[in-house]
Amino acid sequence: MVIKVFLASSSSSVTIKKRQQEVLQFLEANRIEYEEVDITMLEEKRQWMYKNIPKDRLPEQGNPLPPQIFNDNIYCGDYESFFESKESNTVFLFLQLKSRPAQKEL
């Protein structure tokens, strides 16, 4: 399974850009395989993301903002959920990964 991070490459929001970067840096630092899905360029990907976020996790107003995180086709959460899991040291559970990726011996 691959972690998919739905993001907006051309967002004018500094906050969104920082949040996207934080998620990607965490995944890279922990050697977690991931795929970036740019919803600004592909309408079908944006619509897929909207349809696959559980109704109880949608914002009360407007559309869900990036980054949105999936494990393959299973919704994990948004940035706030990711941040909370990072703070409570439960990111691997949040990402629905069995364990940390194996570290290579140097």
From Swiss-Prot:
One of its GO terms (cellular component) is nucleus. A motif (SH3-binding) lies at residues 61-67. GO terms for molecular function: SH3 domain binding. Pfam families: SH3BGR. Keywords: Nucleus, SH3-binding. It is found in: Nucleus. The keyword Nucleus applies. Gene3D superfamilies: Glutaredoxin. Belongs to the SH3BGR family. This is SH3 domain-binding glutamic acid-rich-like protein 2. It comes from Xenopus tropicalis (Western clawed frog).
